Amino acid sequence: MFYSDYLKLLKIFVVGVFPCTLFVNAPHGKLAKQSKLFSKGYISGRVGWVLMELVAPLTFLYAIRNNRHFESTLPSLGDGSNRDYLDSCRKVLAGMFLVHYANRALVSPLLMAPQVSPMHWTVFVSAVLFNFLNGMSIGLYLVQASVQHHPVSIIRRYIGMFLWLMGWLGNMYHDNILYDLRRSSNKKKDPDNLDTVQSENSYYRIPYGGLFQYVSCPNYFCEWIEWFGCYLAAGPSAEPFWWFFLSEILLMLPRALKAHQWYCKKFPKYPANRRAIIPFLM
């Protein structure tokens, strides 16, 4: 199969799931077990998190390592010096993908997150399917289609790399604010305190710092910046990277809106001027 085949399946999956996310709270995290529809069928949040996120880098590496079309793309790329440059571009894009998922699949759930709420098996299966299709489409694209057939300006590439780096760092920074807050909340465990709310086996408090001054889910917003930067670096013809970015928006925006509503409902003193995910707008 070619990258376009997996990309078509990814499009069908995202377009099919998006309407569901508008009306159903994805049963994981602070919104777990809040619907009778998902009252049973939960698995360990930490184990599920690691396994479902590992699918993306593993399928990505499989696509690159075992694709027979890789060598056949190289002769059409020009002389040796041009080929070296093009291969370096592929390596940078692959590095962006793998570095993100190293943090997402291993560092965050195993080293940083103090507690992880259970997740419903439907969330796990959906994430596995998305990560499989996304990992295969992007991995195969890098070795089959060659983003370098449509040269990207140096300025665009470096702007994209800078945005990716800022988004990646911002995502981790705001995640760590939430982790630190949860650690301190779990130690103080005072459900009668209006600034502390219990959900499942975790205690939550109002987060502050960084972009939390403006939005409830800055970690999501930073991840959008991260993958938009990756798309810029890949070039306008890099459709799998564009769809990864678009999928992040379609699948995370409803979650951010529901999380914002949860904060406003649970905390009487929640900042009224704080938006859900985009500063000053939404």
From Swiss-Prot:
Annotated transmembrane regions: 9-29, 43-63, 123-143, 158-178, 232-252
Spell out the subcellular localization from the entry: Endoplasmic reticulum membrane
- One GO MF term, please? oxidoreductase activity
UniProt keywords (A-Z) are:
Endoplasmic reticulum, Membrane, Transmembrane, Transmembrane helix
Q: Which PROSITE patterns match?
A: S5A_REDUCTASE (PS50244)
Q: Which GO terms describe its biological process?
A: steroid metabolic process
What GO cellular-component annotations does this UniProt entry give? endoplasmic reticulum; endoplasmic reticulum membrane
Q: Which domain of life is it from?
A: Eukaryota
User: Which Pfam family name is an example for this entry?
Assistant: Steroid_dh
Q: How does it sit in the membrane?
A: Multi-pass membrane protein
Q: In terms of one coarse class, where is the protein primarily found? A: endoplasmic reticulum
Annotated InterPro entries: 3-oxo-5-alpha-steroid_4-DH, 3-oxo-5_a-steroid_4-DH_C, SRD5A/TECR
Q: Family membership, please give it.
A: Belongs to the steroid 5-alpha reductase family.
Q: What is this protein called?
A: Uncharacterized protein C9.08c
Q: Which organism is it from?
A: Schizosaccharomyces pombe (strain 972 / ATCC 24843)
Q: What are the leading ranks of the lineage?
A: Eukaryota, Fungi, Dikarya, Ascomycota, Taphrinomycotina
